[in-house]
């Protein structure tokens, strides 16, 4: 009997021991640390961790750089000019998730403290004067443009860039949170956040890449901006919240080239906080501003907060759509190359398209500007990727 009792006790102990071991939580991985400098001339993978980026870090052609989910990369403007630059032929793979985004931030938390993420490719561009290539305006002075529509610069998934938009080199070259020069359709841009930069949230210079699930929050210039014949057509779920200071929800231009390959964006929300003033020297606060032959098709839109207001001696004029020059009106509006479809408008003074200058009248052809009471705008899931310091960016 004693032998049986002992055997039973041993078995019971082993059972509970086994349960206890299997139920123990898996310890969190220890974050790696390190410094990121350039140029990066060989493939490099950065494990989950906390890193410091110093200088203009260029990823050379033929090189792939990867960041794991949950990593934080900190920049210090006191070290000088800083940016992460993907040269044509290089690839940047960022594998963030909704709960563990990869965050690029700056120590002082001051807008305009670094140059953000800049990517170059050789997809088609149509630059001023009708040419197919130009030199970047970011201070790097790098040529962009080409014929490789499917250029692949990597994949950016669940990435947040904070406090970018700095002027580089000569003090006149402004950058954005995300800047794409002739980036091609082989590149993935998904679940990206541009937070409190001193210039645009996102800017495209030509190229064929599309972007999905994007948030532009509190950027000083435009939430979304492009030129040089950007041709992305698979864009969806774009959300902008303009607070503190900001120009337009979207600034749309084609470098004065009359073309027929306008971009397409579906599911758009453009919101502007009351009293949010534009940069010095401008008095327009438009949701959509078209100029220099800009065009495209935009659908299922919410526009809120683009109303006229006065601060001090300055009166600001808001509109859902503003056409800034006669050429754009003649070549793009009148030929139905601009379509604003199913837009729900609130707290906005000019609810029909207006002329942003004198000497012409804007009248969209039938069916090219339509309003709706049921438009839903961008559909984005909340989470760590869309939050800063615990506060959601989706208002």
Model-derived features with residue positions:
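Bacterial Sec-dependent N-terminal signal peptides
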Residues: 2-38
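Extracellular beta-rich repeat passengers
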Residues: 27-28, 36-43, 47, 53-60, ...
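Catalytic metal-binding/acid-base residues of hydrolase active sites
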Residues: 72
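Hydrophobic or amphipathic alpha-helical targeting/insertion segments
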Residues: 91-103
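Short alpha-helical basic/polar micro-motif
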Residues: 222
């Amino acid at each position: 009997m004693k032998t049986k009792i002992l055997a039973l006790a041993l078995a019971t102990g082993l059972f509970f021991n086994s349960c206890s071991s299997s139920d123990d939580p898996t310890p969190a991985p220890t974050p790696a640390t390190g410094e990121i400098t350039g140029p990066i001339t060989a493939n490099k993978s950065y494990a989950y961790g906390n890193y410091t980026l110093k200088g203009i870090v260029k990823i050379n052609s033929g090189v792939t750089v990867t960041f794991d989910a949950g990593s934080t990369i900190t920049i210090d403007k006191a070290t000088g000019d800083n940016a992460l630059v993907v040269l044509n032929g290089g690839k940047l793979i960022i594998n963030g998730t909704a709960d563990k985004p990869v965050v690029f931030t700056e120590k002082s938390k001051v807008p305009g403290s670094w140059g953000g993420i800049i990517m170059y490719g050789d997809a088609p561009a149509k630059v001023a004067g009708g040419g197919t290539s130009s030199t970047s305006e970011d201070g790097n002075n790098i040529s962009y443009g080409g014929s490789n529509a499917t250029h692949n610069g990597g994949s950016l998934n669940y990435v947040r860039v904070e406090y970018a938009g700095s002027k580089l080199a000569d003090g006149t070259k402004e950058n954005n949170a995300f800047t794409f020069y002739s980036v091609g359709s082989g590149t993935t841009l998904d679940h990206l956040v541009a937070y409190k930069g001193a210039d645009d949230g996102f800017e495209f210079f030509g190229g064929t890449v599309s972007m999905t699930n994007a948030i532009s929050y509190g950027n000083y210039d435009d939430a979304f901006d492009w030129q040089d014949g950007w041709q992305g057509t698979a864009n969806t779920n774009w959300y902008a919240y303009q607070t503190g200071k900001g120009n337009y929800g979207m600034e749309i231009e084609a470098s004065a080239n009359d073309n027929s390959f306008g971009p397409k964006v579906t599911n758009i929300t453009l919101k502007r906080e009351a009293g949010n003033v534009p940069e010095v020297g401008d008095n327009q606060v438009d949701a959509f501003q078209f100029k220099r032959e800009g065009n495209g098709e935009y659908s299922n839109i919410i526009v809120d907060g683009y109303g006229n207001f006065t601060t001090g001696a300055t009166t600001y004029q808001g509109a859902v759509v503003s056409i800034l020059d006669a050429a754009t009106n003649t070549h793009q509006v009148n030929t139905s190359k601009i379509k604003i479809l199913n837009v729900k408008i609130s707290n906005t003074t000019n609810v029909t398209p207006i002329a942003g200058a004198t000497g012409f009248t804007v009248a969209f052809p039938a069916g090219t500007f339509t309003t709706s009471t049921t438009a839903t705008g961008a559909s984005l899931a909340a989470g760590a990727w869309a939050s800063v310091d615990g506060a959601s960016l989706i208002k």
